Each structure stands twice: as structure tokens, then as C-alpha cells.
Design a protein with these regions (language model features):
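A membrane-topology feature that recognizes alpha-helical transmembrane segments
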Residues: 1-160
């Protein structure tokens, strides 16, 4: 199997993992550590197969993930985001160029806003008490899938 085929298989595996993350977040408001770890550990395989240079490419991906972890850990600390969501975003940051990841964050913000509005409407219709618990993993997964769809349409060698 050539490396480009394997790269597409990795993208497909990432897409499946994102769907699993969304489903489990809807069902239990939890994204498993093993799933986030699998996403993170598959990224270096992707880097090697796509021909990324150690410097600056691979180190840049690790740096991006560190920045994302730092920013979103702050969101977790103030209760604005769950830990699984933070880890999922950090793992996704290992897969994409920082400009592509900024697009993912923009799409995630829009999808998260729509999801929150839908949850608010649902709560009002059902007349339930308590705070709204938004399964933000759904917005993260949606934005990840949207981004993967765009990347997969390009040559796997040109995304970095």
C-alpha cells in the first residue's frame, strides 16, 4: 500500500473517531481519554507519511497543540468547556496546519452557537430546570469533519 492511500485511511480513521466522540458526548456528555489518545498518537504516523520535516513542521504541530491546550485548559478551569473537549481539540491540533486549525475553530464556534441555541429552544419547549449542558464535542466533531472533507479534496502532500 502506498503512503497516499495510507494517509487517506488515517483521515478516514480520524473521521470515524470524531463521529464516535460526537455520539458518546451526546449520550453521556463524556469523550473518552482512550479516543483522544488514539487521535493524538496517530498524528505522528500521519506526519511521517505526509513527508513533514522534523523542523519546523513537526515541532510546529506540537507547539500548536501546546498553545491550544493552554488556551482551552483555561476554558476548562472556568467551567466553560469539558476536559474531554479540551483534549479532543488538542489532539486535532496535531493533525492540521495552524491556519487550517483556525478555520476549524471558526466553524466550531458557529456550530457550537447553533447547537447552544437549539439546546436552549429544546429546554424551553420541554420546560426543564437546571443549566444547559451543551455536548460541545458535537461542534468539535462537526468542524473536524468539515475540515477533513476540505483537506481530503486536496493532495495529501500539499496540506502543510
Amino acid at each position: 500500500m502506498d503512503s497516499e492511500t495510507f494517509i487517506y485511511l488515517l483521515w478516514g480513521g480520524l473521521a470515524i473517531a470524531l463521529i464516535v466522540a460526537a455520539i458518546t458526548d451526546i449520550k453521556s456528555r463524556h469523550i473518552s481519554n482512550w479516543l483522544n489518545l488514539a487521535i493524538a498518537l496517530a498524528a505522528p504516523v500521519f506526519w511521517i507519511l505526509s513527508g513533514m520535516a522534523f523542523w519546523p513542521d513537526m515541532i510546529g504541530q506540537i507547539g500548536l497543540a501546546a498553545v491550544i491546550l493552554t488556551i482551552f485548559a483555561g476554558m476548562f478551569a472556568i467551567g466553560a468547556m469539558g476536559g474531554g473537549d479540551v483534549k479532543l481539540l488538542t489532539a486535532l491540533a496535531l493533525w492540521m496546519h495552524w491556519l487550517t486549525f483556525l478555520e476549524l475553530l471558526l466553524i466550531m464556534s458557529i456550530a457550537g452557537g447553533v447547537l447552544t441555541l437549539l439546546m436552549m429552544i429544546s429546554k424551553r419547549i420541554q420546560k426543564t430546570e437546571g443549566p444547559i449542558k451543551v455536548p460541545y464535542g458535537v461542534a468539535i466533531a462537526f468542524s473536524g469533519l468539515w475540515t477533513i472533507w476540505g483537506i481530503a479534496g486536496q493532495s495529501s502532500q500539499t496540506i502543510f
